[in-house]
From Swiss-Prot:
The lineage of its organism: Bacteria, Bacillati, Bacillota, Bacilli, Bacillales. Keywords: ATP-binding, Kinase, Nucleotide-binding, Transferase. It comes from the Bacteria. This is 5-dehydro-2-deoxygluconokinase. Its EC number is 2.7.1.92. It catalyses: 5-dehydro-2-deoxy-D-gluconate + ATP = 6-phospho-5-dehydro-2-deoxy-D-gluconate + ADP + H(+).
Length: 325
């Protein structure tokens, strides 16, 4: 897939959706009830992907709504310090807060997240706050599935996708399913399908694609056949420790292994995977190599305490791949 076109545009990538606060337990191997110390990081899948791709050297912008308070200012400064453009970032004027995610790390196999997502600012991004002039400066627009969970954010995202299609901007859709933001599975399937049918690149886990198709135990062959009837050029389906698969509209299939690592926690892997996979495509690497980049980046992030701070450099990704091979 050619991401080299429109190289004159200001941004390689603009991500759309939530930016929130992650409070990760400093004390491992204990329940949250006994945890006294947490470290603060920027979180939220589209924010993490913006951070991950910026660390890999891409020119990145962000569209989303944040709180007009200390947490919102922390998020904005952190992203600006990484040279992420925040002209598309909107401050909520009605007192809404950013989401908070407290993480519990009992063991590498037993991690959980306690979410505070009631009345959060990011889900109140409105269609009027989506700028065509901003979006048409991007080569790729990345949509987060969670941003579709509620109005008016849902309509804002659909407008962004429409403007991207109008201005020859590649649409990437990271399914990013979070059950706590949706009313029911039928609603999820409707809006996921609506965006997936307009996306050029779709990335998700096998379980997330099952949510899109409103079924259990779905098969990759059926998923790709459905998506290739529409706009999709590349479909990436992740199967955890079994590795990941990429399918192209031209009929090619690629596979990458999951790289072994000392796992500290399980969250953050998907965001680092998407960041590195897209970086691989922008770098004109083969899809097979881009898959390796994604798998290696995920392996690095799950071995570290944070998600956003732990997003790897290209050298770190390539070193892990070389070591494994």
């Amino acid at each position: 897939m050619n991401l080299k076109k429109h190289s004159e545009r200001k941004f390689d990538l603009i991500t759309v959706g939530r930016a929130c606060i992650d409070l990760n337990a400093v004390e491992y191997n204990r329940p949250m009830e006994e945890t006294m110390t947490f470290s603060k990081y920027v979180g939220g899948s589209p924010a993490n992907i913006a951070i991950g791709t910026a660390k890999l050297g891409l020119k990145v912008g962000f569209i989303g709504k944040i709180s007009d308070d200390q947490h919102g200012r922390f998020i904005e400064k952190y992203m600006r310090d990484l040279a992420i453009n925040t002209d598309g970032m909107v401050k909520d004027t009605e007192g809404r807060k950013v989401g908070l995610a407290f993480t519990e790390i009992k063991s590498p196999d037993e991690c959980s997240i306690l979410m505070y997502r009631e009345n959060v600012a990011d889900l109140y991004l409105t269609p009027e706050e989506i700028s065509e002039d901003y979006i048409k400066e991007a080569r790729v627009l990345l949509i987060s599935g969670t941003a579709l969970a509620q109005s008016p954010s849902r309509e804002a995202v659909l407008k962004a996708v429409s403007l991207a299609r109008k201005n020859d901007v590649v649409v990437a859709f990271e399914l990013d399913y979070r059950p706590y933001t949706w009313k029911n599975s039928e609603e999820t399937a409707v809006y996921y399908s609506l965006v997936a049918e307009q996306a050029d690149v779709i990335i998700g886990t096998r379980d997330e694609f099952d949510m899109m198709e409103n079924q259990v135990g779905g098969k990759n062959e059926a998923t790709k056949a459905y998506l290739f009837q529409h706009q999709a050029k590349i479909v990436v389906i992740k199967h955890g420790v079994e590795g990941s698969f990429a399918y192209t509209k031209a009929g090619e299939t690629f596979q990458a292994q999951a790289y072994k690592t000392k796992v500290l926690k399980t969250f953050g892997a998907g965001d680092s995977y998407a960041s590195a996979f897209l970086y691989g495509l922008f770098s004109d690497e083969s899809i097979e190599t881009a898959l390796k980049y994604g798998s290696a980046a995920a392996s690095i992030v799950v071995s570290k305490h944070s998600s956003s701070d732990a997003m790897p450099t290209a050298d770190e990704i390539k070193a892990l791949i070389a070591q494994a091979e």
